[in-house]
Amino acid sequence: MKIHEYQGKEILRKFGVAVPRGKPAFSVDEAVKVAEELGGPVWVVKAQIHAGGRGKGGGVKVAKSIEQVREYANQILGMQLVTHQTGPEGQKVNRLMVEEGADIKQELYVSLVVDRVTQKIVLMGSSEGGMDIEEVAEKHPELIHKVIVEPSTGLLDAQADDLAAKIGVPAASIPQARAILQGLYKAFWETDASLAEINPLNVSSDGKVIALDAKFNFDSNALFRHPEIVAYRDLDEEDPAEIEASKFDLAYISLDGNIGCLVNGAGLAMATMDTIKLFGGEPANFLDVGGGATTEKVTEAFKLMLKNPDLKAILVNIFGGIMRCDVIAEGVIAGSKAVNLNVPLVVRMKGTNEDLGKKMLADSGLPIISADSMEEAAQKVVAAAAGK
């Protein structure tokens, strides 16, 4: 789960991380009121969407008068902001953040992520803040420094000081940087975050260290422990289909293709999409029904996929381990009838009660295209989507 920058800064503030004074605004008049409360002479008007690259897309403006705050708020609020993370369709801006301007001298980058190889938390930092870290990693990997943090000890003073020095924090400002890094780590740890990022971390001309941005992602599996984080959820920033899927415990992600995929298991789902692309097709979605798929879940999965106007065919690819193939077959048959399925349906099933499941499909009277291998299934669904 993602949250907005102003919400991320609220979290940082709770953990002692220095951030600029600022507030969210949901209208132009509210933005002006916030600016007047903060006082001048400089304000930053920022679009609040769940995507990076807002500055390059025109979603961040520096205002030097109240009139400019009004002008920029009017420009940004309601705009369809396109960044490298939104896709070409962009994201509508429904809220702003207005905060006091900062004396920017040195922009740095710091973040915390989970390293699945070492199964520990990694603190990353770079002297190249204020830009896309992916670009830095590609062109100048030597400028990214990493610290492995032992969960049993947390981020040690020496580790924080060492990273701060490596990314260019002046010696006199290292104690401030240490406090920020340790506060960021505590926020990451105590909220069950999967990402906590400050980009940029600013060092002003008088040596003050302050977080000018805040980005958090949270582990959805841990949200039951954090109702205060769930309260930050902004459904306007999420795909309606994905919101609907979550009600039925379906892992669903919309994609740009025209071939629907219904699979059990995330790994098999990704392999299925790769195989479809290998044979020239484009998946319309990632959909993992999990190991406990019921007739209701399969029916809802079909309904979700059929809401996509570009859908041309569906591939059901099931490995029956915990989930029996006859149960999936029952769900496919009931789901197809319930939604009056009107696109070609290719089904491939392997595993527990495979023969029974295949017989149920064959006896259903539905025009289901069967396949024995993943390659055959992908070829058939690509052909069906193309009308062949």
Swiss-Prot record:
Pfam families: ATP-grasp_2, Ligase_CoA. Residues 9-244 form the ATP-grasp domain. It is an enzyme of class 6 (ligase). Its EC number is 6.2.1.5. Disulfide bonds: none annotated. Signal peptide: none annotated. Mg(2+) binds at N199, D213. Gene3D superfamilies: ATP-grasp fold, A domain (3.30.1490.20), ATP-grasp fold, B domain (3.30.470.20), Succinyl-CoA synthetase domains (3.40.50.261). Pathway: Carbohydrate metabolism; tricarboxylic acid cycle; succinate from succinyl-CoA (ligase route): step 1/1. Substrate binds at N264, G321, I322, M323. One of its GO terms (molecular function) is succinate-CoA ligase (GDP-forming) activity. GO terms for cellular component: cytosol; succinate-CoA ligase complex. ATP binds at K46, G53, R54, G55, E99, A102, E107. Binds 1 Mg(2+) ion per subunit. Keywords: ATP-binding, Ligase, Magnesium, Metal-binding, Nucleotide-binding, Tricarboxylic acid cycle. InterPro entries: ATP-grasp (IPR011761), ATP-grasp_succ-CoA_synth-type (IPR013650), ATP_grasp_subdomain_1 (IPR013815), Succ-CoA_synthase_bsu_CS (IPR017866), SUCC_ACL_C (IPR005811), Succ_CoA_ligase-like_bsu (IPR005809), Succinyl-CoA_synth-like (IPR016102). It catalyses: succinate + ATP + CoA = succinyl-CoA + ADP + phosphate; GTP + succinate + CoA = succinyl-CoA + GDP + phosphate. HAMAP family: Succ_CoA_beta (MF_00558). Succinyl-CoA synthetase functions in the citric acid cycle (TCA), coupling the hydrolysis of succinyl-CoA to the synthesis of either ATP or GTP and thus represents the only step of substrate-level phosphorylation in the TCA. The beta subunit provides nucleotide specificity of the enzyme and binds the substrate succinate, while the binding sites for coenzyme A and phosphate are found in the alpha subunit. Belongs to the succinate/malate CoA ligase beta subunit family. Heterotetramer of two alpha and two beta subunits. This is Succinate--CoA ligase [ADP-forming] subunit beta. It comes from Burkholderia lata (strain ATCC 17760 / DSM 23089 / LMG 22485 / NCIMB 9086 / R18194 / 383).
